[in-house]
Amino acid sequence: MSTKDFNLDLVSVSKKDSGASPRITSISLCTPGCKTGALMGCNMKTATCHCSIHVSK
């Protein structure tokens, strides 16, 4: 198994950097009546299909 088998979107930071930068990526596949909606904590009345939030700096 090589390290290229999985893309975990990891960021390496050296000691010279002044701090870490936020890189948050999340994809929500919540739909009303969706079996995974409850597992993801979605409100079934307000859940929408293929919502996504991407925050990167």
UniProtKB/Swiss-Prot annotation:
Transmembrane segments: none annotated. One of its GO terms (molecular function) is signaling receptor binding. Used as a food preservative. GO terms for cellular component: extracellular region. InterPro entries: Lantibiotic_typ-A_Bacillales (IPR006079). The modification 2,3-didehydroalanine (Ser) is found at S28, S56. Maturation of lantibiotics involves the enzymatic conversion of Thr, and Ser into dehydrated AA and the formation of thioether bonds with cysteine. This is followed by membrane translocation and cleavage of the modified precursor. One of its GO terms (biological process) is killing of cells of another organism. Residues 1-23 form a propeptide. Keywords: Antibiotic, Antimicrobial, Bacteriocin, Lantibiotic, Plasmid, Thioether bond. It holds the Pfam family Gallidermin. The keyword NADP does not apply. Lanthionine-containing peptide antibiotic (lantibiotic) active on Gram-positive bacteria. The bactericidal activity of lantibiotics is based on depolarization of energized bacterial cytoplasmic membranes, initiated by the formation of aqueous transmembrane pores. Belongs to the type A lantibiotic family. This is Lantibiotic nisin-A. It comes from Lactococcus lactis subsp. lactis (Streptococcus lactis). The lineage of its organism: Bacteria, Bacillati, Bacillota, Bacilli, Lactobacillales. The gene is spaN.
